[in-house]
A protein has these predicted regions:
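Short glycine-aspartate micro-motif
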Residues: 2-6, 60-62, 109-113
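Short glycine-rich, Thr/Ser-proximal phosphate-binding strand/loop in the N-terminal lobe
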Residues: 2-43, 128-129, 134-136
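Short beta-strand scaffold segments in enzyme catalytic cores
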Residues: 12-17, 101, 112, 118-123
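Short, well-ordered amphipathic alpha-helical segments that serve as non-catalytic structural scaffolds
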Residues: 39-53
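Short beta-strand-loop/turn "lid" adjacent to the catalytic site in phosphate-handling enzymes
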Residues: 52-84, 88-91, 103-104
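Active-site nucleophile and cofactor-binding loops and adjacent substrate-binding regions
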Residues: 90-98, 113-114, 139-140
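A short glycine-threonine-serine/GTX helix/turn-capping micro-motif
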Residues: 135-143
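Conserved small/polar residues in nucleotide/adenosyl-binding loops
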Residues: 147-149
């Protein structure tokens, strides 16, 4: 089984894939290693996700999420390894890479996320090659929900 996650700060969508077919979709609260400690992430995984998982071992985890910078990805990988029955690789990537892969596939293009926080990048068909820091969800995000007029 492969476990795939698409996470923002508000919610995380999870999907179990077996032999290339999605077999179960689940949801938990958002997981963001920029705002949550390793222990907080472990608690969410143990109490909210683990009870929803089907019996069996997870061969690989692909986590795409807000706050998954190269500096914070190890925190997330450790939390997953300590909380879930994973015997294989645990990969943690940014939500921006998920958007770029989903939108562009293997072609070059510009991908954007418009949500609580907004972001954009230029993707060369394999990786993000240009990205301007979005400054979080409070600064430089004029469309966000925290503005009061």
């Amino acid at each position: 089984m492969i476990l795939i996650a698409d996470s923002g700060s508000t919610k995380t969508d999870w999907c179990i894939v077996f032999n290339g077919t999605p077999i179960k979709r689940m949801g938990t609260k958002g997981i963001n290693p920029f705002f949550q400690s390793e222990e907080e992430i472990q608690q969410e995984l143990t109490h909210s996700l683990l009870p929803q998982l089907p019996e069996g071992t997870i061969n690989s985890v692909f986590f795409y999420g807000a706050g998954c910078t190269p500096e914070k990805a190890p925190v997330l990988r450790r939390a997953i390894a300590d909380s879930l029955p994973v015997i294989g690789n645990i990969k943690a990537y940014s939500d921006m890479l998920a958007a770029a892969r989903g939108l562009c596939g293997h072609e070059a293009g510009i991908a954007c996320i418009l949500g609580t926080g907004s972001n954009s990048c230029f993707y060369n068909g394999k990786e993000i090659v240009n990205n301007i820091s979005p400054l979080g969800f409070i600064l430089g995000d004029e469309g966000l929900s925290l503005i009061h007029i």
